[in-house]
């Protein structure tokens, strides 16, 4: 289970930003779950966070930074060998000194009842630092302390890690040691490596949608078929079921059956709407995350789903019976309707709502709604749209039309000047 994510100098996130799922135990709200830790300790942890903000404010970059960290752990040992340096994306608007600064990533997570902190810093050419701490009885144990600026790059306090010399020897300067250990199936570090493989999956409206459609299609022949069909039917799309069609040696395709006056009719996949295909493509990864207790990242949850669909996805992660493994969801959205219910209640608690804004230098600031101290009965959607919490476009009514008319007028004036010369 993910507790916190921190990052700096990554994409539009110039300064250090933190996204936290942990809430005070004395005020956990109705959504937080109590996570038991070794040493008779516990933490109240949220199953879901929504990130809201104006266009180009950096919402998507928060999720992208999380997947950048995942990719570095999974790929740096096996795939970065062909690079002269590291595959990082620093803040692009930095001055020259800022461009050379390291990119920082860190997570706190719970694995088998033990809290772990793992992080690293990537420079242009090499891994500048890497660290791993555990808290088996509430007290920190340092497993790894890597610092490329020292004469002795690796330090192993307590000598807890096996095959230390081998790990040092096999880890290139531009690769993470955890990536080396996981790829080589190290007995102690592989579980943490596998956490990154099984978590922080990113879904956005377009990228890899065909792969997700193919994945859900394969799931229709497995143990999740009944639930996929049920979620297709309950979505009120007129769908009565799905069938997998295998023609020759090509990849399997899916046909969704629809109600008609003459009975069920199977539609070719190309005839399905964008919204239907988006819902179908989401179901495979969604059910896998719920079954595995994984962290799922969904960019622009509202982009291709009706607000009621988006609300039902949120409710799935909130419901302990539907989500018994403690899966977590981080999503971005432009649509504030997901903040509340039609009856005026709150679908998300203030602690689950995070906002993004860009400053004058193009850097994203990520902050929780709780920083604005909303009232206990305050309508979060109305207050957000009114700009009470920030993170909304700074547009006046009719401003776009006025700017367009002014630009058209200037264009006509320039054309007249060219014609007269």
Which residues make up each language-model segment?
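Extended helical coiled-coil dimerization/tether regions that scaffold
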Residues: 8, 207-271, 399, 404-421
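Short, surface-exposed secondary-structure junctions/capping segments
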Residues: 29-41, 150-176, 283-287, 380-400
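Acidic, Mg2+-coordinating catalytic modules of nucleic-acid enzymes
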Residues: 369-421
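An exposure/low-complexity boundary signal
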Residues: 62-101, 171-230, 319-328, 334-337, ...
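Switch/communication elements of ASCE P-loop NTPase nucleotide-binding domains
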Residues: 1-41, 47-70, 260-383, 391-392
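Electropositive, glycine-dotted interaction segments
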Residues: 115-244
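P-loop NTPase motor core
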Residues: 91-153, 157, 356, 366-384
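Conserved P-loop NTP-binding catalytic core
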Residues: 36, 42-50, 54, 63-124
């Amino acid at each position: 289970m993910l507790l916190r994510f921190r990052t700096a100098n990554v994409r539009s996130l110039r300064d250090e930003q933190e996204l936290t799922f942990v809430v005070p135990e004395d005020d956990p709200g109705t959504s937080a779950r109590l996570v038991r830790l070794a040493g008779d300790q516990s933490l109240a942890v949220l199953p879901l966070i929504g990130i809201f903000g104006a266009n180009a404010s950096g919402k998507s970059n928060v999720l992208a930074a999380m997947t950048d960290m995942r990719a570095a752990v999974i790929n740096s040992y096996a795939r970065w060998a062909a690079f002269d340096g590291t595959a990082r994306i620093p803040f692009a608007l930095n001055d020259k000194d800022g461009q050379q600064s390291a990119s920082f990533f860190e997570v706190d997570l719970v694995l088998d009842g033990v809290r772990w902190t793992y992080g690293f810093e990537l420079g242009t050419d090499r891994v500048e630092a890497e660290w791993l701490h555990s808290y088996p009885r509430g007290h920190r144990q340092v497993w790894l302390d890597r610092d490329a600026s020292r004469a002795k790059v690796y330090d192993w306090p307590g000598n807890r890690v096996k095959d230390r010399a081998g790990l040092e020897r096999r880890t290139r300067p531009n690769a993470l040691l955890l990536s080396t250990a996981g790829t080589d199936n190290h007995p102690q570090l592989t579980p943490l490596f596998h956490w990154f493989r099984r978590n922080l999956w990113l879904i956005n409206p377009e990228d890899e949608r065909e792969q997700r459609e193919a994945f859900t299609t394969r799931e229709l022949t497995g143990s999740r078929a009944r639930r996929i069909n049920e979620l297709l039917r309950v979505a009120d799309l007129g769908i009565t079921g799905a069938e997998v069609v295998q023609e020759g040696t090509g990849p399997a395709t899916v046909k969704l059956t629809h109600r008609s006056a003459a009975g069920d009719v199977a539609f070719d996949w190309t005839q399905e709407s964008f919204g239907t295909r988006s819902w179908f493509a989401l179901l495979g990864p969604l059910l896998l995350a719920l079954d595995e207790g994984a962290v799922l990242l969904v960019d622009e949850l509202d982009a291709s789903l009706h607000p009621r669909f988006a609300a039902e996805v949120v409710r799935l992660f909130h419901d302990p019976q539907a989500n018994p493994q403690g899966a977590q969801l981080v999503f971005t959205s432009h649509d504030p309707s997901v903040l509340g219910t039609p009856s005026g209640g709150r679908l998300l608690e203030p602690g689950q709502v995070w906002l993004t804004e860009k400053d004058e230098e193009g850097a994203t600031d990520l902050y929780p709604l709780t920083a604005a101290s909303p009232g206990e009965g305050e309508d979060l959607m109305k207050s957000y749209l009114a700009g009470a919490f920030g993170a909304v476009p700074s547009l006046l009514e009719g401003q776009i039309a006025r700017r367009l008319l002014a630009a058209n007028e200037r264009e006509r004036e320039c054309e007249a000047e060219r014609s007269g010369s």
